[in-house]
Amino acid sequence: TYGKLAISKTGQMLMGWDSEKREFIYADRSLKGAEFEIYADGDIVTQDNQGDTWFKGGEKVATITTGEKAEFTSDCKGICNYSVDENDVVHITLPLGKYKVKEVKTLYGYVFSKDNEWNLEFTWENGQDEFVLNSTEDTDKSGSLNLRNELARPQISLLKEDADTKETVSGAAFSLCTAQDIYNVDGEKIVEA
């Protein structure tokens, strides 16, 4: 019996430009390249009651790169394994025990979340199950850690003052222009400079 976990990472990506509304169009997509580390939260021991230890408490177990791969510090005789599906979800298997998952790197242009650590626990239920899912509240019912990064969005505040009186002038109109062409996530030019 082993623990089974899926990690997915999404965020808004620039898709297009609505010229009538004069606003950018965004959609959620999977984010490839966010990095997570998994640490043993206490000793992770073999299930044969022989006292062999797979990982010591606090030891790094794996580095996960969303949409790409997982690198384990030990394969635990084939228990530690991974696959990546067509939606860029990384599926991993781990020995039973308690773990901490930490996001250590997000993609350029995305806000690194303050909530970047999650607890996992895979506990033995019976000898019939091939795998068990996380028993903490940090994953959904299917054992998936579904995470989202917010796109960093600049905010601009403009205030027009009278040059002589320094009083605020209401109703002033401003234009915001781009010095470079703007492209969407697929590399298509959507706004010309």
Task: Tell me what each language-model feature is.
Residues 1-193:
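Solvent-exposed loop/turn and edge beta-strand elements of beta-rich ligand-binding domains
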